[in-house]
A protein has these predicted regions:
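N-terminal amphipathic/basic-hydrophobic helices that include classical n-h-c signal peptides
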Residues: 1-25
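Conserved active-site segments centered on acidic
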Residues: 19, 25-105, 165-168
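Phosphate-binding/catalytic loops
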Residues: 103, 109, 113-168
Length: 168
């Protein structure tokens, strides 16, 4: 379980208020990392889990993508999948894909994991600091190099909680 029920309840209350007044909106979020097999799918599935726990999953569209083409079509890297499973988060059916200009136009927010991702994105998409932002004020630990999937889980969870706070 991810916890932080207060955030989940707050977000649920705000969205229920809007729903009752027919002020329906959908928040569209895209997570981006280098290969879309570790960090960005962790962001995608952790946030999906959080909004589902809050009972507001239908108000969010959440996806993930890569800046590179290296892992296209690959599932979540097994150690990342195992770390998510420890916390009750499933990532079944995920296949890595590359970010596109259509994603830029479709998503409200695009969260990248580190400065390298930001550099790639700046060459691929228009520069838009309101839309394209770091998930955290620091780089999210890259478990591909560190091997520390627990630390990456903690970083991703911290970032997803901040997203929940922003939309609550």
């Amino acid at each position: 379980m991810i916890g932080n029920e207060t955030l989940a309840e707050g977000l649920g209350a705000v969205l229920q208020y809007c729903y009752e007044r027919e002020e329906i909106f959908m928040v569209k979020i895209l997570f981006v990392c280098h290969g879309n097999i570790c960090r960005s799918p962790m962001g995608e599935y952790v946030l999906k889990h959080m909004v589902a726990q809050a009972g507001v999953g239908e108000r969010f569209e959440i996806d993930s993508a890569a800046v590179s083409r290296e892992e296209i079509g690959e599932p979540v890297y097994p150690p990342a999948r195992r770390e998510m499973a420890k916390h009750g988060v499933s990532c079944e059916g995920h296949k890595a894909r590359q970010v596109t200009m259509a994603d830029y136009h479709h998503f409200d927010r695009i969260y990248y994991m580190d400065r390298s991702n930001a550099r790639y994105l700046s060459r691929m998409l228009p520069q838009d600091p309101e839309k394209i932002r770091p998930l955290l004020p620091r780089d999210v630990a890259d478990p591909w190099y560190t091997g520390d999937f627990r630390q990456t889980w903690e970083d991703i969870t911290e970032g997803c909680r901040k997203i929940m706070e922003e939309f609550a």
